[in-house]
Amino acid sequence: MSGVLGLPFLFGVGLGALVLAMTSLGQEGKSLWNLAALPINASMLIRAKIIFAVLVSTIGLGFGAVVNVLLVGFSGYSLAAFFLLGITLIIVEASLGVAVGSRFPDFSEGPRPKFVTVTGSIIGSVIGIAVMGAILSPIGVALVLRFLYRITIALSLALSLSVVLGTFLAWASYRLAIRPVQDFLVELPA
């Protein structure tokens, strides 16, 4: 039961990864022209942006794990499930963030740059929350069945379904990001 209390941390870490990845391409600003001169392709740039967002967001996941162990008393299984779900969510949200950020970048520089258009940030936030809900839904269904109806479904099965769904969504988001990044890398003068 204590594992349920870790879900708000997962949502926070997931949204952090989403926002960080969404803004990562727009942060390049005019220095994006430098990328055109480098021997990199779109998939390399996308992977670099995803890896950066994953590494930074993993710090928040570790903090959430420490808080849950100290305050809630996570068991070993709950902690392992928390990390597995957290890493899955971070990778999916970072991939989704780069996909959205590549379609709605804002390269303008000024006193308050946005890095991603308002439309893109709204679309990305709504889709990001929906994706987090979809990934966590097998766990939620298993917990509801267990506590309300006394039907026991192995949480490891629900966790596996969440990870498989997350892996597919991360791959799909990565693939969706490639074409827009290729397009604006080709359009830049070398």
Walk through the language-model features, giving the residues of each.
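Hydrophobic alpha-helical transmembrane segments of membrane proteins
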Residues: 1-31, 41-190
